[in-house]
């Protein structure tokens, strides 16, 4: 019995206390450069360790005390893998929990069973033993339950990184514990242990920062050997003591609040109570802010050059200012330190979805309840000024000599699952909890296919031939290995996107029909483990360069599954290896071969510091309570409207205001002015109303400080600023003035001077720039379909010198920089930033806005998360009904991640909009609103990545789609959003670039103005551009078959009855006049020096008058589509450039398509090159041909409407010169296709040449030969011209009842001139016969010849004729006459002559009937030889309205039946005529 109770006692101790020793819970890989750890709910000991045995950073979590079974019980990682939170998550890890409980239950059962056996054989059963058994069972049941008590849990977190690793941002939100951080390198570090006032001691040693260090702690802060850049910001707060030692010296400003202070003698300080301000070593850039009881600062004298990479624009903002300050910390928050200027752009390429979360984060979490009294330490004397910012740029470090390894990561978010059947949206899901970058493939149904595909949703990087790349992944089975889940092979392939199904759309898929660009299969991978992830890798070495492609991964199992199975993947990636950086030996010396693209002046704006507004002697300080009527400096709060004192010029300095709390509204009265100091500062605000003046720099005193205005407010349509001025922004009333002018960076954008490949970290541009380390740079796409395959990239400058830029990370994609065209490279960062607060802006796309109804001057300003989607008038930067301005401009600004437009000119004339950049905007970007805006200059701007609102306009024919104004589409033309939206062309457009958008430049047709100007009596679409010079557009036009990068089309109208706008996206022509009024001369809309590339149609205008002179088109489906009287001259049309991304069968290219009816088109002085045959073309029109026909219809028939002259064709097979299509179902437009090669340069005949279709009707003499490659007759033109007549037969053929019906009702044949064979073409119900003049045409109608017909001489040109023969029965008599509808002097009655020959040689007023045929010679007597469209030494003759020939026939012997003479023999007239 004694032995029994000893056993029981042991069991009790094990079950009750269940004590665990120190235990490693697991590892978590850190996959993001910006990472956040939140241990606020748990006691944590944090160590930062340099470990060069690893290549990637990771966390090791060790349990020191408490009851935790799995790392998954206490951790949760965000979906983007950037935030790790510690807490009680045991309810989310049911699998592990259940498994542990099961283990406990098994142990319990085993122990009870053992006890029963022990009792049975050693003691025997009785009442006492039964009770003991019950006690044992209860104890084990208690022990088998499992819950986590966080207060009892203590962990150690070891952050291990290789010595070369640098964080972009590291955030630590800490509870109790301690941190010992040694060797950390980061752009910014934010450590906050103040949130719950828990004690956490912080020690830092050998730490390097380049932007900001923010620490808040209730315990001591000990920092040794801190290395910081010359522009870093250091903010330390604690109830206890601070020891701070600098490893590279300290030069900069001080702002310290402390009970005691020991500081180096090299610092010049001023002590006012507990406040100490000043600077060390005359430094001004860095900023040191400390709140503490005791401070010791050593090493302030610089002794060495900082080793860190300097940055002037911190890429993050401090977030550690506690919402609850330590209990012993003074209530004054230092305010002379800005919270840092935020990154103005995404650190990664935006997705193709325009509503992605923008990338600028607010500097702090502001409150509307004031937490500070900012004015206590600010002098109020009139002469006092803070130390103003310097214009100096940080020195660039040396360039790295190698590129970093670049990994393309794949996971659930960017892969689509496809199979033959049995799959859905749940077939791919998140991977196991706690496993970074993992996903699961789920075969939830039995007998799922044994093969499936993972198809990438994002384009692959460009791959060079003969370079080794690695595709790798870790793999684990979800169930133990069996025949159900055995992997037989994994194949990695690269396909052209058009050869794969859309990975965003669920659809069944078996195998691609096309061959891959590259493929490789492995059959011997590590695919057997169900307990641990095993590494797999595949070496990839393409034999040719691979441009635009998608990765497709095929996974094949040995058989279909009989049970549900899961396959787990982690760390799937394609790696581009590191390589040495070797500077190219040659660079582009010009950006174009032919055209001239003007550039902005290379000079900087002249500066005169003596004029700086903060130097004025009549200023008063915001923080001077004596200027306020209440005698109190106004504090920020949720409801106040701070009205500046009337008649005062108020200077605002960092110490004047709270930089963390929100100012509800600031009003500047008409006689007042608000002037900002040129000092780094941040201000949170909702509304600013300017009736007087708002000044933040001037043209001659551009500010150098980092000034950050953050606008707050949830979505509303209320006017909280002022009536009609909306909410959340700055509004300048009529009569008001605003000037915001930051440091000038020039050029604001350039172009590549050599191609940049995926994996490159260094680029070379065409212009020297003064950009700075740490700034953000955009490189635009080099693909055709910008929105579908987003390859725009935003990177951070690591080093820079002149035209060479190196980034902190490698390029993901290929960016072309050949002679034909080059990707644009734009600077996004500015020192002055206006941004929408992310938390209130993102959810409903409701950012800030700036509206100016007075005069406004802006330069060096960045606007981020601005614009309010679908709210009219709420745009990022907007001149609003300012009429004629005299001194307003927007220069070298940037708009980034806009919710609605970029730069708007509305009811305002005389604005200069120049050298600006815009990126990632919803709706039209550069926007002329109502159609009355004229005399503005829009020059040297860049717009990129512009998104439509709603479904992009498409359509199945030339007329596109109709869109009606709605709450989801306030301006229906946003369905075709353009980089530049031009409702009135009467402005100057010089040197602008458009990348992406539905179109690059859109000229919608407005029959009258809209909006506020409905009553203005002009027709906006009748105006021509004042200047169009040197503009470029690319990567657009692809949503609509007839869309273009420069699109002059569409119709925007206002319905007076409904009060709604309507937009039709398709065909709409425009008449243009010299003054814009139809009482003046008709003029041509001219486009000079234009470049289009990667376009659907480069330039499209539906008519009526167009000239495009000096044009380059590269990699476009067609360079231009021009209607009406159109001239394209002096051009290079290049079917294929050196850009490997465009070398795809995604689309074919044609040099020019001649239209099919009623236009006049001349192309002259054109070089066509690189039209390479596409073997799988469905027709000649779809092949890569230089000239193609339009052959789709029998309703629209061509006349003589097309001429070419001085054509040069290079690197193109002769077979590709012309591509005439013969449809399977014949069409009239195909039969009558023709054009004149004016000088024979295109066909190579070198004499004027006539090209006609495949019909023998075009074989008019023995100079004609049929070219089987072209499907055309090619003839020496001689004295012949193209002629067109229309036979109008009542009830049979009518011009007014054109039909797309190609049924034959007869034929027309050549006769005379020695022709004995049939050279004919069919006649159909649609009126119109086109052929060669000065020839015999014989008309035969199958159902007989009518008693009456008209012949319209649409195109029988001056000094030309047609000799027409028509069969009639013998004894028929005739009345033949001519009629000119508009002048009876040309009306003649024909007389009968003696022979057919006499008719042909006669004056055109005679006829002859030989008993079988009526012969007439038709001449248009009205013509005088001036009826033509002439350009470039060539001409296209007019279609002339309405000269008619009437023929009336009667016969009493063989009378007609129902108006037709029947039974006539089809006999060709004599060949001798």
UniProtKB/Swiss-Prot annotation:
Keywords: Glycoprotein, Membrane, Signal, Transmembrane, Transmembrane helix. Residues 1-21 form the signal peptide. The chain crosses the membrane at residues 105-125, 130-150. Residues 376-389 have a biased composition (Polar residues). One of its GO terms (cellular component) is membrane. Its main location: membrane. It is found in: Membrane. Residues 298-400 are annotated as: Disordered. This is G8 domain-containing protein DDB_G0286311.
